[in-house]
Structure formats: C-alpha cells, structure tokens
C-alpha cells in the first residue's frame, strides 16, 4: 500500500476534554486516520483504554499523562526519507500549555494541529520561525468551523465601509481565556481592512470598570460573556448613520467543528510551514 493511501497516525492531547473526546470519536469513525495516542492529565484514569472511557469499545490505545513520552512514541512514525508524512498531534488542552506543546511537537517532527487558544502574537511569531526552520507543516486554528470562517470574511469585507464596530463572543463558563482566540482573530482580519475604529464624540465614563469591554489599539471593542448552557457564539456589529449591520455565528454542538479538524489533519502534512487560521487551509 502506498503512503498516500495509508491511514494518518494521530494522537490527541486533551483526549478526555469536551473537544478532545469529540476528536477521538471522529478519528475512530474514519478509515483515513489511526489513533495512536491519547493524552490527558486525569491521573485516576491513566493507563485505561481511551475507547472504553469514551464508550467506543476497546481501541488498544491507553490514556497517558506523559505528553513528551507520547510524542516520542508517535515520532517513530516520522518518515526517514525527509517527507512530511508523519504523525499528527491534535491539541485541545489549556492556554498555558499551547505554546510549549506546539514547540515540543515540532521538535519531535510531529505535525501539530493546535485548537487550544491563548497563544500570543510574539509566541506565534516564534513558532512560525521554528516551524520554518524544521520545514514542518504546523497549524494553529482558533476556530475549526467553516461557518465562522465565512463570518470572518464577511466582517472583513464590511470593515471597508463602516468606521464603528464592536465584537461580542459568548462561551461556556469553563473556558479559561477571554476574549476568545476566535474573537481576536476576527478583530485582526477586520483591522487588515481599516486601522482606526470608533472615534469618540463624548468623554466616556464607566461607573463599573470594564462595562465598555476591552479596547484594541485600533479602537475595536471586544466583549466576553461566560455562562453555563452556552457552547460558542460570536457577533460582530457595525454601525453607521441610521443603520446597523450585524453578523452572528452560533455553535450549538461541538460536532460542528469535526469536519474542519479532520480536513486540517489531512492537509497539514503537505505544508512545510506554520499556518494560522482555517481559511489558510480551505
């Protein structure tokens, strides 16, 4: 069988989490992929079959808390001929681990696909240089939803015509970072079309600090909501004399992200650099 027809070896970090468990299920349901590792810090479940833990039946893949050891094992799938057809890491862990996990994965020659948000602009620049040096396809994807990519493109197009805009993102109350990486990415795309927003006509005074949200250097304001019952929601509102223009996207189930996740896993091995954003893969 040619390497092009072989299943892609994948390990999942955060395999017991809300997103990670969905990825494990999606990987298991497709013949295009082979689950070779499951990583999570739940010590009480370490060594147990991830399939049994997630109700999938035994998969002969056992949960480990050893991130680097799992990468080392997966790196055995790295081809010796220099081609970028090795294993892929899908990471949905915690913002404080995102940078380290990405860099370590690249160092082991395992293609990182990072859905964990919280990577700073400086860290992104460093990781981009590191991936370039390694000539290893790597991906940092703030949001895997095709619908969100379409919203971002529409928002960027609208920014050419509106000088006033504010963004609101809403997530479940177990999300650690605010604003979300998706919201920041949307703001960045909008700012590529216009550098200054929301010039003030009055001297604003907040009676409760933070009432007006966080303001970026461009003047764009970002607002975050955290409540149980939410999954992921974003609204971009533009305003002008006599009208508002609103764009919104709502994720009601995490299965909506899986087509994007699987697409990136399939395509990232054909890259030799770091890509940021799903729109660079589509």
Swiss-Prot record:
It is an enzyme of class 1 (oxidoreductase). InterPro entries: DapB_C, DapB_N, DapB_N_CS, DHDPR_bac, NAD(P)-bd_dom_sf. NAD(+) binds at residues 14-19, 115-117. Coiled coil: none annotated. It is found in: Cytoplasm. The lineage of its organism: Bacteria, Bacillati, Cyanobacteriota, Cyanophyceae, Synechococcales. This is 4-hydroxy-tetrahydrodipicolinate reductase. Catalyzes the conversion of 4-hydroxy-tetrahydrodipicolinate (HTPA) to tetrahydrodipicolinate. Pathway: Amino-acid biosynthesis; L-lysine biosynthesis via DAP pathway; (S)-tetrahydrodipicolinate from L-aspartate: step 4/4. Its main location: cytoplasm.
């Amino acid at each position: 069988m040619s390497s092009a027809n072989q299943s892609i070896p994948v390990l999942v970090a955060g395999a017991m989490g809300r997103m990670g468990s969905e990825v494990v299920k999606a990987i298991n349901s497709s013949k295009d992929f082979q689950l070779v590792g499951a990583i999570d810090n739940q010590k009480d479940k370490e060594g147990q079959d991830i399939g049994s833990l997630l109700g999938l039946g035994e998969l002969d893949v056992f949960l480990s808390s050893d991130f680097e050891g799992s990468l080392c094992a997966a790196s055995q799938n790295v081809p010796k001929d220099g081609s970028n057809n090795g294993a892929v890491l899908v990471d949905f862990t915690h913002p404080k681990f995102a940078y380290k996990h990405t860099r370590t994965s690249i160092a082991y020659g395992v293609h990182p696909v990072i859905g964990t948000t919280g990577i700073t602009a400086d860290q992104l620049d460093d990781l981009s240089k590191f991936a370039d040096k390694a000539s290893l396809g790597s991906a940092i994807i703030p949001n895997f939803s095709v619908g969100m990519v379409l919203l971002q493109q529409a928002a960027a197009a609208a920014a050419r015509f509106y000088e006033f805009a504010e963004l609101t993102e809403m997530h479940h109350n177990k999300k650690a970072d605010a604003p979300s990486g998706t919201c920041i990415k949307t703001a960045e795309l909008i700012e590529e079309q216009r550098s200054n927003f929301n010039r003030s006509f009055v001297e604003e005074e907040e009676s409760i600090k933070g009432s007006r949200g966080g303001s970026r250097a461009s003047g764009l304001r970002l607002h975050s909501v955290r409540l149980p019952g939410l999954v992921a929601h974003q609204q971009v509102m533009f305003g002008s004399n006599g009208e508002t223009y609103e764009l919104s996207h709502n994720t009601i189930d995490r299965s909506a992200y899986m087509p994007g996740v699987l697409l990136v896993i399939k395509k990232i091995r054909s890259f030799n650099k770091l890509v940021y954003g799903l729109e660079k893969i589509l």
